[in-house]
Regions:
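Cytosolic regulatory regions of ion transport systems
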Residues: 1-183
Length: 183
């Protein structure tokens, strides 16, 4: 818009055209937010050759990430046309990588309008909103505080000589108990 105004062009009147990020996205992962967590997720997806598109509202981050070869687009993930352009309805998974509950719930609502079957994974600081998110249609909630605790205890047990298989089994058992100890 700024470039158009600088050239003396007038912004178009009426509704802006819907974004079109890519025409061949299917069975991909949509990453909502491309900060530290979103970038880490993308790095692992890329290493496994799993297609993804990331969406972020920071134009500098988007530009720099695109220059580095990342499939990142500018857009507010609470806007239906942005998620539609990212082909949420054809994706295998939507990841909400920011830990803001209200914003996450808005995104979940829009995703569910576009697809009632796509899996949704949400990052949260803790499990405070676990039931609300699950009831809204979230497939999995990842509470940072518990995951950090599980990682720490894994290292403690490993350094204390506990076999890796037993550590993995115990950690999985704790996750299966659905994070109830954090209240």
């Amino acid at each position: 818009l700024a470039k158009k105004l600088a050239r003396g062009e007038r912004p178009e009147q009426g509704k802006a055209a819907a974004p079109n990020f890519s025409t061949n996205l299917t069975n991909h992962v949509v990453i909502c937010g491309f900060g530290r967590v979103g970038q880490t997720v993308a790095r692992f997806l890329k290493a496994e050759a799993i297609p993804y598109i990331a969406l972020d509202i920071d134009p500098i981050r988007v530009r720099e990430s695109q220059a580095a070869g990342e499939n990142v687009q500018f857009g507010h993930v609470r806007q239906k046309d942005i998620l539609k352009a990212a082909k949420v309805d054809k994706s295998r998974l939507v990841i909400i990588s920011f830990a803001d509950y209200a914003k996450a719930m808005s995104v979940v609502s829009v995703v569910r309008q576009l697809s009632d079957s796509v899996k949704i994974l949400v990052r949260m600081r803790d499990d405070k909103y676990l039931m609300e998110l699950t009831n809204a249609g979230v497939t999995e909630v990842v509470p940072e505080s518990l995951e950090a605790s599980l990682m720490l205890v894994s290292h403690v047990l490993f350094m204390s000589g506990v076999p890796v298989k037993r550590i993995l089994r115990r950690v999985q058992q704790e996750r299966t108990n659905r994070y109830g100890i954090l209240h």
